[in-house]
Amino acid sequence: MIKDMIDSIEQFAQTQADFPVYDCLGERRTYGQLKRDSDSIAAFIDSLALLAKSPVLVFGAQTYDMLATFVALTKSGHAYIPVDVHSAPERILAIIEIAKPSLIIAIEEFPLTIEGISLVSLSEIESAKLAEMPYERTHSVKGDDNYYIIFTSGTTGQPKGVQISHDNLLSFTNWMIEDAAFDVPKQPQMLAQPPYSFDLSVMYWAPTLALGGTLFALPKELVADFKQLFTTIAQLPVGIWTSTPSFADMAMLSDDFCQAKMPALTHFYFDGEELTVSTARKLFERFPSAKIINAYGPTEATVALSAIEITREMVDNYTRLPIGYPKPDSPTYIIDEDGKELASGEQGEIIVTGPAVSKGYLNNPEKTAEAFFTFKGQPAYHTGDIGSLTEDNILLYGGRLDFQIKYAGYRIELEDVSQQLNQSPMVASAVAVPRYNKEHKVQNLLAYIVVKDGVKERFDRELELTKAIKASVKDHMMSYMMPSKFLYRDSLPLTPNGKIDIKTLINEVNNR
């Protein structure tokens, strides 16, 4: 059991200073280097005299300097807000407006000019590292202090900043490194694929740093090259694969992704979206000896609240795979619409309680009050997911209560997509709906569009109109939120309350 994340890193800097903590295609950084670099960066950050415990936005990709900066900020007492290099400018602005960071650290070139907030460039971080300044930790992040803040999709088009404390992180990390389902070895060799702005990344970096392992990262140029990406992954000595099931499905398009070509790969950790029977079955065919662990949980409960090893028997007998045994320190309940606890086998909303539950959304008391509450004297969170518990305390997933979905590993609120589409000067009304496959997994996003008067006449074909609408909103939307198909209508169905009847459109798309 670890009691402090930085203490663990510092310990390995003493006992295995030359062991690699980070490897990007053979370019390695050691635990000794991570300590020296993070100490120097922390000293530099202290010299800026920022407001104590104020959050700092860090912009970049899957690089070592991002990791070193995160560690430095933790040492200097600041929560970090990871923002991926591929984020839309409008989203970055929204995050800045909500979070009010005291500083922006741009590991990659920052796409915006922000008044009133200082910006530190990569060259300044490099200069700080070269200074090799010693650092004495007197005010590092601890206890209920925010460790990181990750922004997720919001129902009003505004992202929500989930605050995860040091205590929250310890609850998750200690469970993961001690739980028999994960079976994390000492010095784990982990693939670092999900971006730091996606909390699934915590599932690889937290246990790796806690156990003195190595993170194998991929440069962003390689990630964009599908063929080269999976050829390269097959050559990495990774023992543990952490990703969404969708990314594994992509990997299985490559013949090199198999046990014969990747004998070191023994564990698969999945979270972020539903693991289907077909994906698990294909993985067992490719990696007959591998362990497949299915984890479940919202960002607000610190990455995951349950996990289970998927067996071949489960693949043969379940139509939807179980999502795990709840964490011992995080009692999980099923409640009805009145908040009453339901018995085993009864379906209702999944709620999670205990020390992994976030304190709420940053600077958003209204949304915090809606989602976070107290249950049986413990901090609790409404997941909005439908589920049930078996008599053996295995959690089963039954879908979403609302219109929030998981697609390609990302959590997306349909209203968020609709709001972004409605910003197009050509659109009068728009709504996004998911199309599901037979395994209840989101196959793609579609958009129903009513265009403004005179717009259709400007285009010879609907394809050209679709391209024009996409171009008009691409600077406001994350690419994974863009619907793959646009359906044009003269009007959209309404509920008796005068709202767009999304349920009817979902049923229409899915032939219900």
Swiss-Prot record:
Its pathway, per UniProt, is: Cell wall biogenesis; lipoteichoic acid biosynthesis
Query: Is Nucleotide-binding among this UniProt entry's keywords?
Result: yes
Any one GO MF annotation of this record: D-alanine [D-alanyl carrier protein] ligase activity
Q: Cellular component terms, GO, for this chain's entry? A: cytoplasm
| Location relative to the cell | Cytoplasm
The similarity comment for this entry is:
Belongs to the ATP-dependent AMP-binding enzyme family. DltA subfamily.
Per the entry, what this protein does is: Catalyzes the first step in the D-alanylation of lipoteichoic acid (LTA), the activation of D-alanine and its transfer onto the D-alanyl carrier protein (Dcp) DltC. In an ATP-dependent two-step reaction, forms a high energy D-alanyl-AMP intermediate, followed by transfer of the D-alanyl residue as a thiol ester to the phosphopantheinyl prosthetic group of the Dcp. D-alanylation of LTA plays an important role in modulating the properties of the cell wall in Gram-positive bacteria, influencing the net charge of the cell wall.
Q: What name does this protein carry?
A: D-alanine--D-alanyl carrier protein ligase
